[in-house]
Amino acid sequence: MEEILKLQKKLYIEEATPSLELRQDRLNRCIEMLKKYNVEILDCIQDDFGNRDYNSGFLTEIMSTIGSLSHAKENVKKWMKDEKRRSNLSQPFPIRTLMSLLGSKSWIKYQPLGTVGLISPWNFPINLVLSPLGTIFAAGNRVMIKPSEFTPATSDLTEKMFKEFFDVSEAAVITGGPDVAAAFSSL
């Protein structure tokens, strides 16, 4: 785990802020991954829970997740733009007036954090990994994912899917029990 985190941090520093195209590519790969593995996902959820309806699982785990990933893909360009703000609204009136006369300008520049840790709960094991992943990738971050140990079949499939679609420098899945989760959250 620590080696993966070091690698992701190193590459974040070396490669700087990811482009719009790379962010959209990562989101596209998530969508393609869901489309390719949708039957296996539902089978694993059935194995883990034993009583999930395939239709409701398809709606909650696959379709709603594709919807949130598509939403992120459609809006990532807008979310990346710098946001202009009025200058010095918190300053006293004379200073605010002087600063505006001098032509000061303010903006918010959105930048990625680097590597984000994502610990998923057991109840919606695919949706609660990939829906937040949409905003994580849209923001330009890399991710380390710890799926729930209470859904072992789905966690193993999640690891397999991510190994196929992503390099560990972009997204890594760490499986294991409570001891792994404790070590993961302490990174």
Where are these regions (language model features)?
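N-terminal Rossmann-like NAD(P)+-binding subdomain of aldehyde/semialdehyde dehydrogenases
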Residues: M1-K105
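Rossmann-like NAD(P) dinucleotide-binding subdomain of oxidoreductase/dehydrogenase enzymes
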Residues: K81, S90-L187
